[in-house]
Amino acid sequence: MLDSIPLFPGLPGGPELLIVLLIVVLLFGANKLPQLARSSGQAMGEFRRGREEIEEELKKGAEGGDDEGENGDEAEADDADATETEAESR
């Protein structure tokens, strides 16, 4: 019985898209639609650029190995020792 009920019926067809478009026009007004489309396009472009930058950083990190993490930990330990020495000298 449950196998015959689709949970996700698929993409909306023509009549459904027209209803959604009508609701969008009623909510935002016909004059604001180009501005809304422009701003959503810019947001999608920024999201895409950010995703690509993160993917590049992950690839560089995978190629470089874990050497950077080990050096960073040593540098933090040296900074902590220097801070302790300064505190003791006061």
UniProtKB/Swiss-Prot annotation:
Keywords: Cell membrane, Cytoplasm, Membrane, Protein transport, Translocation, Transmembrane, Transmembrane helix, Transport. InterPro entries: TatA/B/E (IPR003369), TatA/E (IPR006312). Pfam families: TatA_B_E. GO terms for cellular component: cytoplasm; TAT protein transport complex. The chain crosses the membrane at residues 8-28. HAMAP family: TatA_E. The keyword Nucleotide-binding does not apply. One of its GO terms (molecular function) is protein transmembrane transporter activity. GO terms for biological process: protein transport by the Tat complex. Its main location: membrane. Residues 39-90 are annotated as: Disordered. Forms a complex with TatC. Cytoplasmic and membrane-bound TatA form high-molecular-weight complexes. Part of the twin-arginine translocation (Tat) system that transports large folded proteins containing a characteristic twin-arginine motif in their signal peptide across membranes. TatA could form the protein-conducting channel of the Tat system. Disulfide bonds: none annotated. Residues 64-90 have a biased composition (Acidic residues). It is found in: Cell membrane; Cytoplasm. This is Sec-independent protein translocase protein TatAo. Residues 46-63 have a biased composition (Basic and acidic residues). Belongs to the TatA/E family. It is a single-pass membrane protein.
